[in-house]
A protein has these predicted regions:
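Short strand-turn segments of transmembrane beta-barrel domains in outer membranes
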Residues: 26, 43, 55, 60-90, ...
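Flexible loop and strand-edge segments within Gram-negative outer membrane beta-barrel domains
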Residues: 106-113, 117, 131-181, 186-212
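Membrane-embedded beta-strand positions of outer-membrane beta-barrel proteins
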Residues: 70-74, 99-101, 124, 136-138, ...
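Hydrophobic, lipid-facing positions within transmembrane beta-strands of outer-membrane proteins
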Residues: 54, 68-72, 82-86, 118-122, ...
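Outer-envelope beta-barrel architecture signal
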Residues: 66-70, 82-84, 93-97, 118, ...
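Surface-exposed beta-strand-turn/loop segments characteristic
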Residues: 24, 97-116, 121
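Flexible, glycine/serine/threonine-rich loop segments and coil->beta-strand junctions
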Residues: 7-9, 13-32, 40-55, 64-67, ...
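Residue-level signature of outer-membrane beta-barrel architecture
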Residues: 90-92, 126, 171-175
Length: 217
C-alpha cells in the first residue's frame, strides 16, 4: 500500500476515496504491517502520479517459508474502547494466503461520540517461478461514527454510516535489472451521511452516496 502526497492531499495509489479526497485509515489491518517507509519529495516514477510530494509506503508481511501462522490481539481502555484484530497467514510451496479481520469500538469521551468499525482483508498469491507471480486481494471496511460538534454548541444526529471496498488483481515480474506489473483494480463505496443540526435548528439533508472506480496499472 502506498500513499502519495499531492500538496495538502493524500491518496492511496490505485485506491482512491473520491468523496473526501483521502484514504480511510480505518481500512488498514495493522497486523499485516512489516514496516513503514517514508519518502520525502517526488516519487512518481515508482509510485504513480499522486506521489508528487512524497510517499508513505506500508510494506506488508510475507511468509518466507512453508507453514501456518495465526496471531490475535485485543485491547480495552477508557470510554469502553475495544480494539481487536486477528490474522492468519499460510504458505505452501508456490501458494500463499493472508486473511485478517478486525473490530473496533468506543463510546467516546462525550455523548453522541460513538464509533464502531468492522474490517476484513484477504489476499491470495501464486509464484510461477522466482521472477513471475500472480496475486489478488480484497479489502472491506464498514464503520459508524457520530460527531458531537463543539461542546458549547453541540450537533444532534451528525452521524455517518460508511462502507468501503477494494479489490485488485496483479501479474508481476522481477528480474535483476528490470521489473514490471499489470494490475486491475476496482473500488466501491456507500456513504450515508447526516449533517446533523444544532438544538433549535432545522434538520439537514441526509446524503446517500454510492460510488465506484475502475482502473488498470
Amino acid at each position: 500500500i502506498s500513499l502519495g502526497l499531492v500538496g495538502s492531499e493524500m491518496c492511496i495509489r490505485d485506491r482512491y476515496m473520491g468523496l473526501m479526497g483521502h484514504p480511510i485509515a480505518d481500512a488498514y489491518q495493522t497486523m499485516l504491517t512489516d514496516r513503514v517507509e517514508v519518502l520525502r519529495g517526488p516519487a512518481s516514477v515508482l509510485y504513480g502520479s499522486n506521489a508528487m510530494g512524497g510517499v508513505i509506503n506500508i510494506v506488508t508481511r510475507k511468509m518466507q517459508e512453508d507453514g501456518v501462522k495465526t496471531h490475535a490481539q485485543i485491547g480495552y481502555g477508557s470510554y469502553n474502547t475495544l480494539q481487536t484484530e486477528v490474522s492468519n497467514r499460510i504458505r505452501k510451496g508456490s501458494f500463499s494466503s493472508v486473511v485478517t479481520g478486525s473490530y473496533n469500538r468506543t463510546d467516546g469521551h462525550r455523548d453522541n461520540m460513538e464509533f464502531e468499525q468492522y474490517g476484513g482483508y484477504a489476499k491470495l498469491g501464486y509464484d510461477f517461478n522466482d521472477s513471475w507471480k500472480l496475486w489478488g486481494d480484497v479489502n472491506i471496511t464498514q464503520f459508524k461514527a457520530s460527531n458531537p460538534g463543539e461542546a458549547g454548541n453541540p450537533y444532534i444526529d451528525n452521524d455517518s454510516r460508511i462502507t468501503r471496498g477494494m479489490t485488485s488483481l496483479a501479474l508481476e515480474n522481477h528480474y535483476e535489472k528490470s521489473s514490471g506489473a499489470l494490475s486491475f483494480f476496482y473500488n466501491w463505496g456507500r456513504h450515508k451521511i447526516n449533517d446533523g443540526y444544532h438544538p433549535g435548528g432545522t434538520c439537514r439533508e441526509l446524503r446517500n452516496i454510492e460510488l465506484c472506480h475502475i482502473g488498470t496499472g
